[in-house]
């Protein structure tokens, strides 16, 4: 494959840290920049095996390939594909650029400073107040080049949120016809799910909260509509090993585990469009990393955010900041219980999780209505790609 470049292209470098979160965000951004702004994008990724789980047609053995108009290069050490400076250089989530790239930038700065790309560090999404003041700030590097911090966020003063131009219209059209979700479940090999059943998707880290919820759902399912929990192989299922008939690694996509009237369904991996549609089709979504966290919000369905645990419980500060924003227009009693449910889930508090789930009834109409209204409030008139393009033009 040709790796020729021109001065107008953008490079995005991404290291895969949490299997799918980081690459999920950068892959969506790369596709949107190509599709909506016709910007040539080269995406450098260090772990193509993980990437292939959300892009099944990707060949992890190739050093360079193209999908959706995006050139995908395998980020090797040293680089197997030469880096050719373009207009913009994006470090996703503070990844460390390859030495040969930094050396090339330093040389360019000395010999042809006008050819140095605009260098951006795409940061993690946060709802904390300090993000407004830090977005767009420059940091002088040893080479003498400025690197700018680009912070996604929920306010007009931040870098915005990744959201494709037609996403909400596609979601609304999908959700208007119940047949769509049933056809999706069938295509994923998920059997015996009826339109009136309660369906929950689970994409969390390991946690004691999941066995607690499964215990609750088993008991409730005897008196209510059947409950289906949809889980991919991986970290969520590890928490339920004691309920499974075999080791997690031995489970197959489409397999069912019946626990009374609660049924666990093993999900196959799917591409990003399939994942979006899955979230659109479930009554409640339990999500984790940045990509699934944001897509659960765009799904306009109630959700629980299992935030990535950090030292000194800093993740709980980030969780509180988001909950404060999300609950701003929510009735105080529902906001209080939804907040407590999220905190209890992220801390593995089994008794509290069951109590707050029962108190909240997450598929209740007020919370569902709020979930439908939230995406319009959160987008704040402009998405991340739009703001990013504007930022580059102004810089």
Swiss-Prot record:
Domain of life: Bacteria
Catalytic residue positions: 22, 290
Substrates-to-products reaction catalysed: dTDP-beta-L-rhamnose + L-arginyl-[protein] = N(omega)-(alpha-L-rhamnosyl)-L-arginyl-[protein] + dTDP + H(+)
Binding site residues for dTDP-beta-L-rhamnose: 19-22, 205, 272, 288-292
Entries under InterPro entries matching the protein: EarP
UniProt-recorded Gene Ontology molecular function terms: protein-arginine rhamnosyltransferase activity
Pfam family, one: EarP
Keyword check for Glycosyltransferase: yes
Enzyme class at the top of the EC tree: transferase
This protein's UniProt keywords: Glycosyltransferase, Transferase
Enzyme Commission number: 2.4.1.-
UniProt keyword annotation of Ubl conjugation present: no
NCBIfam families listed in its UniProt record: efp_Arg_rhamno (TIGR03837)
Family: Belongs to the glycosyltransferase 104 family.
Chain's role: Protein-arginine rhamnosyltransferase that catalyzes the transfer of a single rhamnose to elongation factor P (EF-P) on 'Lys-32', a modification required for EF-P-dependent rescue of polyproline stalled ribosomes.
Free-text note on domains in this protein's UniProt record: Adopts a GT-B fold and acts as an inverting enzyme that converts the beta-configuration in the dTDP-beta-L-rhamnose donor to the alpha configuration in the N-linked (Rha) arginine product.
Protein name as it appears in the record: Protein-arginine rhamnosyltransferase
Organism in which the protein naturally occurs: Shewanella oneidensis (strain ATCC 700550 / JCM 31522 / CIP 106686 / LMG 19005 / NCIMB 14063 / MR-1)
Gene name of the record: earP
């Amino acid at each position: 494959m040709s790796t020729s470049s021109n001065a107008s292209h953008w490079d995005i470098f991404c290291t895969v840290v949490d299997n799918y979160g980081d690459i999920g965000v950068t892959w969506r951004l790369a596709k949107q920049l190509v599709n909506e702004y016709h910007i040539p994008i080269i995406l450098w990724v260090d772990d193509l095996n993980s990437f292939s789980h959300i892009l099944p047609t990707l060949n992890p053995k190739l050093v360079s390939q193209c999908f959706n108009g995006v050139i995908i290069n395998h980020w090797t050490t040293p680089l197997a594909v030469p880096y050719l400076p373009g207009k913009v250089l994006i470090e996703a989530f503070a990844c460390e650029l390859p030495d040969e790239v930094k050396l090339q930038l330093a040389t360019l700065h000395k010999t042809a400073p006008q050819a140095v790309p605009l260098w951006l560090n795409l940061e993690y999404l946060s709802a904390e107040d300090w993000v407004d003041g830090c977005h767009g700030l420059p940091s002088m590097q040893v080479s003498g080049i400025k690197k700018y911090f680009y912070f996604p966020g929920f306010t007009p003063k931040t870098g915005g949120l990744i959201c494709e131009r037609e996403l909400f219209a596609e979601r609304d059209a999908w959700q208007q016809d119940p047949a769509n979700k049933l056809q999706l479940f069938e295509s994923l090999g998920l059997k015996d799910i009826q339109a009136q059943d309660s369906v929950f998707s689970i994409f969390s880290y390991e946690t004691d909260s999941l066995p607690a919820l499964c215990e609750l759902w088993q008991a409730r399912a005897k008196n209510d509509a059947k409950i289906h929990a949809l889980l991919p192989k991986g970290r969520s299922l590890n928490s339920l090993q004691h309920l499974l008939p075999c080791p997690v690694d031995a489970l197959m996509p489409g397999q069912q585990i019946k626990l009374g009237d609660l049924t666990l369904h093993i999900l196959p991996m799917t591409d990003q469009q399939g994942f979006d549609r899955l979230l659109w089709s479930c009554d409640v979504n339990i999500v984790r990393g940045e990509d699934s966290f944001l897509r659960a919000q765009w799904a306009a369905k109630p959700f629980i955010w299992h935030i990535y645990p950090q030292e000194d419980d800093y993740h709980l500060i980030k969780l509180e900041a988001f909950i404060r924003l999300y609950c701003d227009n929510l009735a105080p009693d529902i906001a209080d219980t939804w907040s407590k449910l999220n905190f209890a889930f992220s801390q593995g508090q089994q008794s509290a999780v069951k109590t707050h789930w029962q108190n909240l009834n997450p598929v209740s109409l007020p919370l569902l209505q709020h979930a439908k209204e939230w995406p319009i409030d959160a987008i704040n008139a402009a998405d991340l790609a739009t703001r990013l393009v504007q930022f580059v033009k102004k810089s």
